Amino acid sequence: MKVQVEELSPIEKKLSIEVDNARVAEELSRAYSNLGRQVRLPGFRQGKVPRRILEQRFRDQVEDEVIQRVVQSAYVEAIREHNVEVVATPQVTNSGLKPNTPFTFEARVEVKPKVEAKDYVELPLTKSDTAVTDEQVNEQLERMRQSMARLEPVTDRDTAASGDYVTVDFDATVDGQPFAGSKAEGITVQVQPGELVESKIAALEGVKVGESKDIDYAFPQEYRVEEVRGKTARFHITLKGVQKEIVPELNDDFAKQSGVAQSIDELRTKLREDMEKARKSQVEGEEREALMKALLERNTFDVPRAMVERAMDSMLRGALQQLQRSGVDPRQLNLDFNRLREDMREKALQEVKGTLLFESIAQKEGIQASDADVDARIEQLANEAGQPVAVVQKYFKGADERLGLSLRLREEKTIEFLRSRAKYS
């Protein structure tokens, strides 16, 4: 087999490949033999159909299959032999099969660019404080109190007051016509200023249980139900009950109810630790972005479209999975997934370039993640998840999963190296 590699650009190559006739003839012979064992033709016993008859009837089909096999195997051999780092499916053109003639084809491929990072010492960074104040801990405790509040019926009055939670039935129309979700019973809303679609209706203040009130509401342009976007609806709302919010006191019982700690002091300590960990992660993310931005300003190069498209797909999957983890079904949001994905293009481009620059710096500086590093991270992940190490190890048992973790650790080490050489302000 003969292979000629031509560089069309730093991100595209053309492989011209010639496969000798003997190899093609062997593939043809194997294909006709397999076909002969399977095909049934009148006048011939199965497995005894002469090849010339098979050629007359099935030549085009057999040659197409042989071309596909020869192209696939020869292409894989060629990129391995010449160390071509392909990032997308090749565009192939071929000469077709001709008797006693070598088979030739060309494959145009997008390739991973060879990036040589420069000017990566003394990148500008802003010093950030990861400390958590007592005030921030208290604010988080208050949020926890509010989230653990319960509702109790109001017994000393039957009129809704500001801040109350009320149970209502409603029936709504737009231009006199109902719409999707326009009718509901037993819905709880709060009597306070805000958006009706956020379950806040200040206009119910002063309404008595059993009374009804008509309220006009203009839906936002981005509302999830397309038929009422930007339109004004009339809601006929009937008050069914009044409740008040009971917020628990900050004491040991509250800590136990949270399921996090056995005392309020222990809860404060754990909250501070979690908040400091979250703040540290936030700062690290911000510094990674700042380092990447500075590197991209100092290093200009092109990347294959396929790498960007793949990054866009990954980012979209991540965004949708985050919604699902938050208990939101993306399918219920009427999202334009194509537009959402396209909006990620610039971010994906920067991410691909930044990752390549981090890889280049790691290679130049001899930064690696050892097997011991990978094992230590797996143990850390297991401890954080409260799972046995063996369970988490199973997830990283595959070569691809372990390699992915190793590359992530190498990038973390590279970023730490850049931080140690950065110029802080």
UniProtKB/Swiss-Prot annotation:
Keywords: Cell cycle, Cell division, Chaperone, Cytoplasm, Isomerase, Rotamase. Consists of 3 domains; the N-terminus binds the ribosome, the middle domain has PPIase activity, while the C-terminus has intrinsic chaperone activity on its own. It comes from Myxococcus xanthus (strain DK1622). Its EC number is 5.2.1.8. GO terms for biological process: 'de novo' cotranslational protein folding; cell division; chaperone-mediated protein folding; protein transport; protein unfolding. GO terms for cellular component: cytoplasm. PANTHER family: TRIGGER FACTOR CHAPERONE AND PEPTIDYL-PROLYL CIS/TRANS ISOMERASE, TRIGGER FACTOR-LIKE PROTEIN TIG, CHLOROPLASTIC. Belongs to the FKBP-type PPIase family. Tig subfamily. InterPro entries: PPIase_dom_sf, PPIase_FKBP_dom, Trig_fac, Trigger_fac_C, Trigger_fac_C_sf, Trigger_fac_ribosome-bd_bac, Trigger_fac_ribosome-bd_sf, Trigger_fact/SurA_dom_sf. It catalyses: [protein]-peptidylproline (omega=180) = [protein]-peptidylproline (omega=0). Involved in protein export. Acts as a chaperone by maintaining the newly synthesized protein in an open conformation. Functions as a peptidyl-prolyl cis-trans isomerase. It is found in: Cytoplasm. Residues 163-248 form the PPIase FKBP-type domain. The gene is tig. It is an enzyme of class 5 (isomerase). This is Trigger factor. Pfam families: FKBP_C (PF00254), Trigger_C (PF05698), Trigger_N (PF05697). One of its GO terms (molecular function) is protein folding chaperone. It comes from the Bacteria.
